[in-house]
């Protein structure tokens, strides 16, 4: 099974096949409305506006698994994103990305690209310190570590990159551009 064999539910509960995005460059991101990384919505929306007409899509999967930072209903989350960031990209139903109840899309993505570290800088060090308090062995498993982890999928459905929430958004935009 590949990327295009996966599906998720949209905020209204309709099944959305990843096959709908066949031939496009896709960024799948687990999000939250009450996270220190929530302002990344602004940069995600800018990427969407810049590249959507060239075949770029974002699949936004709200998730409440990290310190309960997406506590609202699907409608409340959607309204928050519209009001604060004017997001236009597709937003899915809130879902688990880790554990027994993780949706199939995330099981697949994690099987393709595991955790490779938080990178450099103060935020990366802070995330590493936080994760050590949660799971001393966090570096050894492919699980999603926090909100705003991103997976980049090329036009053929290959998962080509995983970006942790600490990744530079300009670096992500450049990776998207290179695939368009």
Place the predicted regions along the sequence by residue.
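Conserved helix-turn-beta segment immediately C-terminal to the redox Cys motif
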Residues: 24-25, 33-62, 81-85
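N-terminal "domain-start" segment that seeds a small globular fold
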Residues: 1-19
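Hydrophobic beta-strand anchors of alpha/beta hydrolase catalytic cores
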Residues: 25-27, 150
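Non-catalytic, surface beta->alpha helical segment in thiol-disulfide oxidoreductase systems
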Residues: 160-180
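Amphipathic alpha-helical repeat scaffolds
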Residues: 10, 30-34
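Thiol-based oxidoreductase modules, predominantly thioredoxin-like and allied folds used
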Residues: 55-72, 88-99
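Thiol/selenol-based redox catalytic cores and closely related redox-interacting motifs
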Residues: 80-82, 86-166
């Amino acid at each position: 099974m590949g990327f295009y064999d996966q599906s998720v539910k949209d905020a209204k509960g309709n099944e959305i096949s990843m096959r709908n995005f066949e031939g496009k460059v896709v960024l799948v991101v687990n999000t939250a409305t009450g996270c220190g990384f929530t302002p990344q919505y602004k940069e995600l929306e800018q990427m969407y506006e810049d590249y959507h007409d060239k075949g770029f899509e974002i699949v936004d999967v709200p998730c409440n698994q990290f310190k309960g930072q997406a506590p609202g209903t699907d409608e409340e989350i959607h309204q928050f994103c519209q009001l604060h960031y004017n997001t236009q990209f597709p937003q899915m139903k809130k879902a688990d990305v880790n554990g027994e109840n993780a949706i199939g899309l995330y099981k697949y993505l994690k099987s393709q690209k595991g955790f490779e570290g938080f990178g450099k800088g103060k935020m990366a060090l802070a995330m590493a310190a936080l994760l050590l308090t949660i799971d001393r062995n966090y570096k050894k498993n492919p699980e999603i570590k926090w909100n705003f982890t991103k997976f980049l999928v090329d036009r053929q459905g290959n998962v080509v990159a995983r970006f942790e929430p600490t990744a530079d958004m300009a670096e992500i935009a450049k990776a998207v551009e290179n695939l368009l």
